[in-house]
Amino acid sequence: MDERLPERAHLVTEQVNPDSARLDRLDSPSLVELFCREDERVVPAVRAAAPAIARAIDLTAAALRGGGRLFYVGAGTSGRLGVLDASECPPTFCTDPEQVQGIIAGGTAALTRSVEGAEDDPEAGAAELAGRALSAADVVVGISAGGTAPYVSGALAYARSLGGVTIFVACVPTNQIPERWDIEIRVPVGPEVLAGSTRLKAGTATKLVLNILSTGAMVRLGKTYGNLMVDVAVSNQKLRDRAVRILTTLTELERTAALALLEASGLRVKVALLMHWSNQDPASCATALEAAGGLLPVALEKLSGR
């Protein structure tokens, strides 16, 4: 065997799915039914990885609380999913864009088109993190459906060399790709409907894992109140409306009064809530919130104890 071209036939992500062997013969309703049936494998696979995902949430939240950052690193579909999840954190949780970052092999050009060979360079993955001043305070989540992308392994190895937390997300079992990293989130969903096309079930499973990881970490950081998005960045009309509805829900104010409260707070939902509940001015509420590490109940207790 040519060592320059490693054999991947043993990987479940590369295997042929016998249930879709007649894919090219199916009519459209049958195609839809087949895809739906295969996608039913995804949630159980993610649920089976729940203990590892929970540990990843806790380590990530601790790192972010201490001033560290979260980096997603991947190639192709895996990289795009990481960039997607990272890009949703600022509007959803009002995070600094530097706090959660997505890195894709081949750079931004690879978001819309394939960059040939980009995933095959382990040094490039490490160099990208070095260029972003990675430190031991940070968390790196390497995403590789088949578990073999050198770009991802290079990034994880660099993170480990600095003492940072390393998390690996893959859709192959450990008997195919052995464990190497601090946390291994394995979500094997079986062969794809279209053999080797990991943008399908593997991509769906990866998206679910990242959804849970980032949202769970933000919940731990106090970015929600109950299940409400109280740290939403009010950057457009849709989000302004959402912020007003959050205020009406939690304060029982009428919509007009809630909008006035939001504007008085500087479009900061948490500050607006503290203003309403404590009858304090915006600056005092913002100061209490900062002192409480962004935790709304703790900030309210500080204000109420004055």
UniProtKB/Swiss-Prot annotation:
Where, by residue number, is the active site? E88, E119
Q: Which part of the chain is the SIS domain? A: 60-223
Keywords for this protein: Carbohydrate metabolism, Lyase
> Pathway of this protein?
Amino-sugar metabolism; N-acetylmuramate degradation
Q: Which Pfam families match?
A: GKRP_SIS_N
PROSITE patterns linked to this entry: GCKR, SIS
GO annotation (BP), single: peptidoglycan turnover
InterPro entries (alphabetical): Etherase_MurQ (IPR005488), Glucokinase_regulatory_CS (IPR005486), MURQ/GCKR (IPR040190), SIS_dom (IPR001347), SIS_dom_sf (IPR046348)
Chemical reaction(s) catalysed:
N-acetyl-D-muramate 6-phosphate + H2O = N-acetyl-D-glucosamine 6-phosphate + (R)-lactate
What molecular functions are annotated in GO for this chain? carbohydrate derivative binding; carbon-oxygen lyase activity; ether hydrolase activity
| EC number, as in UniProt | 4.2.1.126
Under the heading PANTHER family, the entry gives: GLUCOKINASE REGULATORY PROTEIN
Q: What else is known?
A: A lyase-type mechanism (elimination/hydration) is suggested for the cleavage of the lactyl ether bond of MurNAc 6-phosphate, with the formation of an alpha,beta-unsaturated aldehyde intermediate with (E)-stereochemistry, followed by the syn addition of water to give product.
Q: In which family does this protein belong, per the annotation?
A: Belongs to the GCKR-like family. MurNAc-6-P etherase subfamily.
Q: Function, please?
A: Specifically catalyzes the cleavage of the D-lactyl ether substituent of MurNAc 6-phosphate, producing GlcNAc 6-phosphate and D-lactate.
Quaternary structure and interacting proteins, as annotated:
Homodimer.
Q: What is this protein called?
A: N-acetylmuramic acid 6-phosphate etherase
Protein species of origin? Gloeobacter violaceus (strain ATCC 29082 / PCC 7421)
Q: What is the lineage of its organism?
A: Bacteria, Bacillati, Cyanobacteriota, Cyanophyceae, Gloeobacterales
